[in-house]
């Protein structure tokens, strides 16, 4: 069940990320270019049902809208209150559930390589859910925290200061 707890502090970073994605979405393409290696920015003006693709290892969040992802027999729903993490290449069917020209689907993500995943696993405490430790899924969602949202905001904000990307993007990405 999605966490529907409203956190007013999240609106500032969420709105800032949305503005930056919309400022770059000028050519009508859903996947926008970003000068930061591994950073993914996505805008869709209409719902799309059951698009087949392969998700690379990544952490992603939805700034506006919602999505359904089918991985084998499992269906994951996530929206503005959740984040998604994939630990390996996974074939999925994905559907953007909420999107319109007036309120487009906006997403942001960061590709991860196996070295980053291994390092994070060694240096971080084992992640948990409200019900205890996470299971061994290759893809899952979790409650979006303000620190994660703020880290994505700082990363996307670097696109407005390209002279700082080389020095700061790796630090924010690691965060």
List where the protein language model places each region.
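A short, N-terminal "cap"/entry segment at the start of jelly-roll beta-barrel domains
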Residues: 1-35, 39-42, 48-49, 132-136
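Amphipathic alpha-helical segments enriched in hydrophobic/aromatic residues interleaved with Lys/Arg
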Residues: 2-13, 17, 117-175
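Acidic-enriched, low-complexity/disordered segments with a strong bias for Aspartate over Glutamate
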Residues: 3, 27-28, 45, 81, ...
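Arginine residue identity/basic-tract feature
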Residues: 14, 19-20, 24, 43, ...
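N-terminal regulatory/effector-sensing and dimerization cores
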Residues: 31-128
